[in-house]
Design a protein with these regions (language model features):
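Active-site microenvironment for binding and transforming phosphate-containing groups
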Residues: 1-154
Length: 156
């Protein structure tokens, strides 16, 4: 892991550093405004954290990235094997439709530039995939259920 920010709030993967057309990172708990159980850099809106703190943390994350993404796409993960392809259908959906599309999703896949696909992990494994020929990225949340159900093989 390499630090992408001076305050070490974002870490990167050396193995993916040679691909300048993608940004790949892990956030830490440091550098945000959330308090209590969510202290301090919580960017996930599904935790019960204060909505304004989550918004500020997400804005700080977007500002810290090499290219400002038009959207952080954060699914409501349920330790399933369900995935969502972020494509024109998602892009043209209403906010309410997007929220519904992201329910129960544990893997995001896209070839659309400008979107930041996100997964949340604690004791689970983040699997980040990149197909440089087709310029497709995937972010897979692999908990024990996903591992048992071969979630990573489904998406490779």
């Amino acid at each position: 892991m390499i630090s992408l920010t001076e305050d070490k709030r974002m870490l990167g993967y050396e193995a993916l550093a040679p691909y300048p057309d993608i940004s790949c990172f892990v956030t830490t708990r440091h550098g945000g405004c959330s308090v209590g159980n969510y202290a301090s850099f919580n960017c996930t809106p599904y935790t019960g954290d204060d909505t304004e703190c989550v918004r500020k943390n997400q804005e700080a994350l977007r500002a810290a990235l090499p290219a400002y993404p038009q959207e952080l796409i954060i699914p409501f993960q349920t330790h399933s094997t369900d995935s969502l392809v972020i494509d024109e259908t998602y892009q043209h959906a209403t906010c309410s439709e997007r929220h519904s599309m992201l329910q129960g999703i544990d893997a995001l896949i896209t070839d659309m530039p400008g979107y930041c696909i996100c997964i949340s992990t604690a004791d689970c494994i983040p699997i980040l995939l990149y197909d440089k020929q087709h310029r497709v990225v995937a972010a897979v949340h692999a908990g024990w259920r996903g591992t048992v159900n071969r979630l990573s093989l489904i998406h490779i």
